[in-house]
Design a protein with these regions (language model features):
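Conserved SAM-binding loop
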Residues: 1-110, 120-137, 195-202
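Hydrophobic anchor at the start of a short beta-strand
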Residues: 25, 142-143
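Short secondary-structure boundary/capping segments
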Residues: 35-36, 115, 188-189
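General small-molecule cofactor/ligand-binding pocket signal
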Residues: 44-46, 143-146
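Phosphate/oxyanion-binding loops and surfaces in catalytic or ligand/nucleic-acid-binding neighborhoods
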Residues: 100, 137-141, 160-163
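Short glycine/proline- and charge-enriched loop/turn segments
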Residues: 109-118, 159-167
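Flexible, active-site-adjacent loop/turn segments at secondary-structure boundaries
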Residues: 114, 121-123, 146
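A C-terminal cap/extension of S-adenosyl-L-methionine-dependent methyltransferases
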Residues: 146-202
Length: 202
């Protein structure tokens, strides 16, 4: 029965899944070329928060999500603050970002991976600490910041051996759920997973 706002929804893959279980889903996406796609699949997606406010008035949401979005924003603190009025008093914001303390960057110091990462379109890289600080500066309480490892050990080994991506596909023979869970648990314990997921509230 929850309502959801996905900020920076891209092609709306998550919204389409959420639509099956949420009472109402709404998106914000700046890419104009996707508007025809949103209409085709029956989604309400606005180009910015101003347009959302105009059409949805004072509507507030149980959950606001930002998946792989915050690191692309020129002023993430301001944007988080602007999202606050759209969040219900007992709602939460879920943020997913790459971890600046990714093991390949800071533990293994893989130069090809560093070049691959730092030449991307990310304007910011967050650690668990800087993500917490940003949330507090934007006026939120932090419920948690979790370490999540998206890429497998085979991906990391391939980067270290070959200096290239897609190791999880090319060396898929090393793929094992048990192995991945153990690797993720160990990286999380020392703060070096590749992804951070945070929950914020008012």
């Amino acid at each position: 029965n929850n309502t959801l706002l996905d900020f920076g929804c891209g092609a709306a893959g998550f919204l389409l899944k959420a639509k099956k279980i949420a009472r109402k889903v709404v998106g914000v996406e700046v890419e104009k070329r996707l508007q025809s796609h949103f209409k085709q699949v029956g989604l309400q997606v606005f180009q910015d928060l101003s347009e959302l406010r105009t059409h949805m008035k004072d509507e507030k949401y149980d959950v606001i999500t930002l998946f792989s979005v915050l690191e692309h924003l020129a002023d993430p603190r301001t944007v988080l603050g602007e999202l606050s009025p759209f969040l219900k008093d007992d709602g939460q914001i879920i943020i997913e970002v790459p971890n600046a303390n990714d093991a390949l960057l800071t533990l293994f110091k893989c130069e090809p991976y560093s070049q691959f990462t730092y030449w991307s379109c990310h304007l910011f890289l967050f650690t668990a600490e800087t993500l917490r600080d940003l949330a507090v500066q934007a006026g939120f309480s932090v419920n948690y910041v979790k370490q999540i490892q998206r890429y497998t050990l085979s991906n990391h080994l391939y980067w270290l051996a070959k200096g290239k991506p897609r190791g999880h596909e090319i060396w898929s023979f090393l793929g094992s759920e048990v192995l991945h869970e153990a690797y993720e648990k160990q990286l999380a314990a020392i703060g070096h997973c590749d992804t951070l997921v945070a929950s914020l509230s008012k």
